[in-house]
UniProtKB/Swiss-Prot annotation:
Transmembrane region(s): 16-36, 52-72, 84-104, 129-149, 162-182, 185-205, 242-262, 284-304, 337-357, 390-410, 416-436, 439-459, 522-542
A single Gene Ontology CC term: apical plasma membrane
UniProt organism field: Xenopus laevis (African clawed frog)
Alphabetized Pfam families for the sequence: SSF (PF00474)
Protein's name in the database: Sodium-coupled monocarboxylate transporter 1
Residue ranges that the UniProt entry lists as topological domain Cytoplasmic: 37-51, 105-128, 183-184, 263-283, 358-389, 437-438, 543-622
Amino acid sequence: MVTPGNIGSFTVWDYLVFALMLLISAVIGIYYAFAGGGQKTSKDFLMGGRSMTAVPVALSLTASFMSAVTVLGTPAEVYRFGAMFIIFAFSYTIVVIISSEVFLPVFYRLGITSTYEYLELRFNKFVRLLGTILFIIQTVLYTGIVIYAPALALNQVTGFDLWGAVVATGVVCTFYCTMGGLKAVVWTDVFQVGIMVAGFTSVIIRAVVVQGGIGPILNDSYYGDRLNFWDFDPNPLKRHTFWTIVVGGTFTWTGIYGVNQAQVQRYIACKTRFQAKMSLYVNLIGLWAILACAVLSGLAMYSIYKDCDPWTAKFVSAPDQLMPYLALDILRDYPGLPGLFVSCAYSGTLSTVSSSINALAAVTVEDLIKPYIRSLSEKKMSWISKGTSLLYGAICIGMAGIASLMGGLLQAALSIFGMVGGPLLGLFSLGILFPFVNSLGAVIGLLSGFAISLWVGIGSQIYAPSPSSSLPKPLSLEGCNFTSIESNWTSTVMPMMTTLIPETQVSSRPELADSWYSLSYLYFSTIGTIVAVLVGVIVSLLSGGLKQNVNREFLLTSEDFSYLNVLFSPCKEKGQEEKVEVLNWKARRTDNDMEQGTDNPAFNNMEMTSTEKGEKTNGITA
């Protein structure tokens, strides 16, 4: 039996494996900095050219948000609370369908670089500016968390200075992102997904061998109440149930995959709309695989430590250190494998941070610089894009300090996306799904949704949820083999009561602490989205939104569903078409366009003009 507290340490082979991962990542960045003549324009840097295909983009989509937060946080979540997290597989499926069928058609059709360009096309510049600012705040905070996560792992298993690791993480990914642009980010993500799967696989296989097969792991998990998949309790105060994960998780992750710049920027870079959609659906397989690996790792961790919990015994100082502790514990006799797992966690972060930096650079250049400084040449814009990437890399390193104060990494990360991503999802939904929503409704809806989600999110951080809604499952110390411990435990079985509220603070808790502030963190996004949509719709109806004529190119239409177009197009009769505006793409193809070819308007030099139905543009009737 594995005995906690007596783990090995990093060897030369582990450091070599880890260094090799960093070296390959950096080399990819250097290669794409100079391949094909380098990053000559901001489009080359931010959009990766014009010929990305589905599979590498799909793997990049998977890697971008399956970060070290997933590698470290999800197994610890399963270890403490059970395998309910596997229900996210349903959420991911719904999210991919919504993203590919609702949001992708509109963004791809318009050929935009920044998703927030859409907000100006559909509403006005002020709405675009609001959306951009919220995205920057959200992404910088989240990136700080995912930089801190692998540094924590390195600190635990190698003794490497925590903040030295934070700086190293930020510097490495900022380097290859700044050098190679989106192409470097995508292809480095492909490599790093492989490292993530390999790291998880090494831990799972060794755990199965140690425990004598998968059967004992599942048996221990069953009797330890970790196989709690089907909790249909509708109580929104319970941290994880089927409904909080499927409903709340769907809203949270749609805010990421449907409208988040880091993800949209990738599938917009695909050379055809079919390739873009395929990238999302292939990415779904990757999400399932990483989720399954993380959950199985958590169950294996419980089976191994069910009689001696390393956290309760204070062998680790935080739940997010449990997974690297397990890796070094069971892989200590196999030089190089502990280094592979740390590379796994590190790869998740490098992919996420580089994606975030590239997205931050894109929205800053497209939304905050280009609209106001139009005289800059493409070469200067390319250098500005690289400089912006470097700046955001430094900012995100600084923001990692906040992550050390936010508690559990997984919940902190998803909470940020919920509080900010929910209202933004509501804003884009207003524009794409509701033709009568006007700029006033969009602004008030966004601000209302953000205020509500921020209220509940900050309240939940100040006032911990009640123990009944978030109490981890019991863990034992009865199998520990130690003679002394720096604690005052007197029982051999000790549940981890980390969320209990000191008695001295109970009287100071407001009434909302056990209701509104105790909502599951997964509902933060749901609340923000629903409030933004409802308020936006009501304000628009009251302010004359029904009188406006919105360009159909900015809306989701039946033509965006090919099967609906086939079914209903024969039913249309001549003379019944409405008088609507359409966009006319005046493509000015360059020689490079003709050489490579693409049906994605994002990569053509074009002018957009508005023409009414029946008028002619370039000899073509609209």
